[in-house]
UniProtKB/Swiss-Prot annotation:
SMART domains: BHL
Pfam families from the UniProt entry: Bac_DNA_binding (PF00216)
Encoding gene, per UniProt annotation: ihfB
GO CC terms in record: chromosome; cytosol
Organism: Allorhizobium ampelinum (strain ATCC BAA-846 / DSM 112012 / S4) (Agrobacterium vitis (strain S4))
Source organism phylogeny: Bacteria, Pseudomonadati, Pseudomonadota, Alphaproteobacteria, Hyphomicrobiales
GO molecular function, one term: DNA binding
GO BP annotations listed: DNA recombination; regulation of DNA-templated transcription; regulation of translation
Name of this chain's protein: Integration host factor subunit beta
């Protein structure tokens, strides 16, 4: 699903709202999540999951074309950890022994 499809679905479920307003709301929510992550904050949507940023330290890598070693600088990467309700909905009937951490 892409953002425009999400806007269409939300607008269809809420016929009292204009499509333009739904698009503005979706964009505002995504902008706020992005701004929070850019500030180093964690964004938790209870039951759905939590967005955060993790540091990927610098390392020595390899150029796949030439085989030469290259230095890869450290960087911050977005990370998403699923919430319990989302994991249960994706895996009905399974025990919740895994914490859903993709590390």
């Amino acid at each position: 699903m892409i953002k425009s499809e999400l806007v269409q679905i939300v607008a269809a479920r809420n016929p009292h709202l204009y499509h333009r307003d739904v698009e503005n709301i979706v964009n505002a929510v995504l902008d706020e999540i992005t701004d929070a992550l850019a500030s180093g904050n964690r964004v938790e949507l209870r039951g759905f999951g939590a967005f955060s940023v993790k540091n990927r330290p610098s390392r020595t890598g390899r150029n796949p074309r030439t085989g030469d070693t290259v230095f890869v600088e450290e960087k911050w990467v977005p990370f998403f950890k699923t919430g319990k309700e989302l994991r249960e909905r994706l895996n009905p009937g399974m025990d919740d022994e895994d914490d859903g951490d993709a590390d």
